Amino acid sequence: MKISLKRIDDAFNFEAVNEDGKTVLIDAAEKLGGRNQGVRPTQMLLMARAGCSGIDIVSILKKQKQQIDDFQIEVEGEREVIKEEVAKVFAEIEVQFKLQGNIDPGKAKRAVELSMEKYCSVEKTLRLAGAKIGYKIYVNGKEA
């Protein structure tokens, strides 16, 4: 896996490109001198967390012939300073999986568990870094 990052203005705006030519803009907050024209690196980490499970869960549920009409994942992370360092790390992350459709809640729950515990490499990376990750699953508005 390889990406390339290029600065595209005189501030903090960067364009990241993957091996397939797909791009994403990265920028700092305005209060730090950025222009707010891209996502923050830590936001990208939470996006990656959601995307990783999203792919896992859709794959599992499709194999089980579950009809997914809508699927949203919301991720909220709390960061804290470790010891005397300036950088903040994610200490706690809460994930909400919201599925709509003709979906068996038990199958949805199992798909999420498999992603969280076995398949999602972003999840494993965050846990190894010390983040405590919790989650809730909703199928058609009801907690599963």
What are these regions (language model features)?
Residues 1-47, 58-144:
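Extended beta-strand/beta-hairpin segments
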